[in-house]
Amino acid sequence: MGGNGMDRIIDIYEMMKNVRRISFQAKSLEGSSTGWNYVGKGNVVVREEEDRLYFIEEIILDNDIRYSDRKLWEFKENYIGFYRFRNGDYEKIFEFLFCDGEFMMKKEYLCSPDLYYGEMKIWDNRICLLIKVKGEKKNEVLEYTYLT
């Protein structure tokens, strides 16, 4: 894998365009009132458009509920942008900067009254997106693991 940030971002783009599967886990932690405790697996369809990869996800949760989601990954010279699809459009949540050999969240995301924190970990054939949500009624960890 490349050593500098741009090389690493290109490597991740090449890897992510081959993602086909997802495993998902949601956990409610102490103080949460949401009851988000799910595990699921599913498939991902990836659509390429210039410096963007659109993920169309179909997940079957452990309670047999189907869950569909869409995400957008934007690959820039010095960061990877992460967007979620909400209210009919893509909304930027995080920018992950390449720093000291790993991707670091530039800043947390506020969706009042909740604050979102993100982590992105890369292994040989897996990408893990970890999102922590904290607020008055929420204390959740959402883990998306993408597999090629």
Language-model features: locations:
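Soluble ligand-binding/transfer domains with enclosed cavities or grooves
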Residues: 5-145
